[in-house]
Each structure stands twice: as C-alpha cells, then as structure tokens.
C-alpha cells in the first residue's frame, strides 16, 4: 500500500507516500526503530497506522501480513514507544516571539498562543471504573485537555482524566507547579477559552450572557456590536480548537472506538496520535485539506 499510488497510501495509512517514508526514516534515525529479521520498519509502521487509523483489530492483520498475533503486538508496541519518544519534539509551546497570523480571525488576538478546551475520547475500562469515566452524555471517555495553535497543531495535551471530570479541573491539574510536564503560559501570552473557564491571567474568555452563533451572523448583513462583536471575533478564532478535535478523531479512528488495550496503553496511544497529528500538520497536503473540508461541513451542519 505504501508502494502504490499516493491516494491508496493516504486512504489506508492516512499519510501520503512521501510523508509515510519520512516518518519511517525519522523513526529509524532518531528513535532507533530497526528492521527485524523478517519485518521491515515500513511494515511495522504500516501495521501501526492501520490499527490507529481504522481501528482494525490486530487479529485482522494476521491474514494480511501473514504474521503471528504476538509479532504484530510486539511491533505495534515498538512503534508506539518510538513515536512517544518524539513527543517533546512535536508537542511544545512556540517561542516567546511567535505571533498569531494577521488574518481576519487572529488579527484581534496577536499575543494569543491559540485556544484550549477539553476533548472527550472513547475508552474501554473495567465495569467497576465505568462510573468515573462516564461523561454527561453517558459515554465512557477520557477527558483530554488540548491546547492548539492557529495552524491546528497541538501545543500541549493532557489525556487520562476520567470523562466525569470537568474541563476546568483537568486544566488545574495541568498547571500544577509540581508536574514535570506542567502547562505554563509564557508571560504576556494567553489562550482563548470558552465560557466554561474563568477569565484571568493567561486566559481570555467571551462575555457571559451574550448570545452569539457563527452561522447566524454569517447569514446576516447585520453587524454585531460591542460585546456581541467581541464574542463573534472570539468565537471565530477559538473555533480552531473544535476543528482540530474533529479532524484529530476523524483521521485516527481508534479515538472514536472502544479498544481492548489496557487503559494505560489507551492513553499512550492517544498521545502517539497527537504526535502523528502534528507530524502531518507540519507537512500539509491537498488530501489533508479535503479531509478538513469534511470537518468544516460537519461543524457547519451541527446543531447550535
């Protein structure tokens, strides 16, 4: 599949041929991933991408690759570990001098890092733990904090919290000073947040009790004023985090499916998918843009 057409490679592995081979080279040179006696790095990475991209069960890969289940599991684990070793390189805050683009969405928020919110991702846990992981929509999820920039790249993620936990509680945990991977907003910078978070240093929320909907204003010639205008501009820019989450879960289907991995491995897989997401965003391709059009269409037709 990675030696065929670009379209076939993207459909199966969610990366173009060039990006797939670039990823394999990176995992070889920087992470120490090696060919085994019978399995190349390319085959290992392809098996991993099939599992996370299509939520294919490893047993299904036995017939395709003529490998034992033990071999597939071992190589999946090796690729997962290799990707996680790149976490600090791909998921990090920008330099202190980075500025938001001067476009119609972000020119009002020049010192913004981007936007943040919580993202619920399906997980499978023991029956005894399901109450803690059940969110307000009754789904069994982990609540992941995601901070994204204007290019839809993750700057910081914290998966692992139970789905019943509020977004603000996850953010407080991320900012604990005794965390080795604490989320620290550089002085003079801030993130756009929704009304569920508190306005304060480093966080810019919309005016409360002011109604606004992007679709309503887009269809009207009337211009909103004062607080409504601010909230409209805020929402237009902050929408990047919602677009990112939808794209993230659409591209890596394992994030929308309950899998039979241990919960700790499920969280590690989420982090690895964040690395893959940023890797792909750094190497944008027209096929990624087509997928993004699907995302925007879904959001445009979603109920308010």
Language-model regions, residue ranges each:
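Short, well-ordered secondary-structure "scaffold" segments embedded in the functional core
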Residues: 57-304
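Structural motif corresponding to the C-terminal cap of alpha-helices
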Residues: 27, 31-34, 51, 55, ...
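Short alpha-helical segments in extracytoplasmic peptidoglycan/chitin-binding modules
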Residues: 16, 47, 61
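Charged, often Cys/His-bearing segments associated with DNA-binding zinc-finger transcription factors
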Residues: 1-35, 85-88, 290
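Short, amphipathic alpha-helical "recognition" segments used to contact nucleic acids or chromatin
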Residues: 42-54
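Short, surface-exposed loop/turn segments at secondary-structure junctions
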Residues: 33-41, 256-263
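Generic alpha-helical secondary structure signal
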Residues: 18-22, 46, 243, 247
